[in-house]
Amino acid sequence: TEIILVGNKDIRGCIACGTCYEKGKCVFNDMVNELALKFEEADGLVVASPVYYASANATLIACLDRLFYSSHFDKTMKVGASVVCARRGGCSATFDELNKYFTISGMPVASSQYWNSIHGRMPGESEQDGEGKQTMRTLARNMTFLMKSIQLGKEKFGLPETEPKTPTNFIPVSYTHLT
């Protein structure tokens, strides 16, 4: 288990340049490329964020956009979990926002007894949220169980069969109408 803080780092957002498809990593050579190597080796990923305006920390979103877009290893059956912390509101929207990275990547999402949120504004305040702390303990047990179960399933049955992706673009690629 390793804890990596990204919210206070200088991480650029994705510019959709496509270099990651050519070189296998993001054109911006920063901690995102290092995280991709660690993520590839991991069985699971927990992403946590404070809630700002019913959304996750912007630096974290830039990191996740680039991490998930530029890393081309198979994320299928790596377990994901998101955890959010707010003074009051916005937890559900932020929780949903973070889980989208997992679900679009074929990653099972670990759940708890409630949405994975805890409340507090200042450091230490979340210690007073008894239900939130219980939710986190339950999440840890459930995620551990899910990772172990998936590992046993891989050994006994292998991974589910996959199909080649069938991408759909709702906008025609022809730009001749602009000339």
Locations of the language-model features?
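Mobile beta-alpha loop/short-helix "lid" or hinge segments that flank ligand
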Residues: 5-12, 103-123
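N-terminal beta-loop-helix "entrance" segment that forms/cooperates
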Residues: 7-25
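Helix-loop-strand module that forms the ligand-binding subsite of alpha/beta enzymes
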Residues: 27-114
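Residues forming the flavin
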Residues: 123-133, 140
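Short, hydrophobic alpha-helical segments
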Residues: 140-155
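A short, charged, Gly/Pro-tolerant segment at domain boundaries
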Residues: 155-174
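Conserved small/polar residues in nucleotide/adenosyl-binding loops
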Residues: 176-179
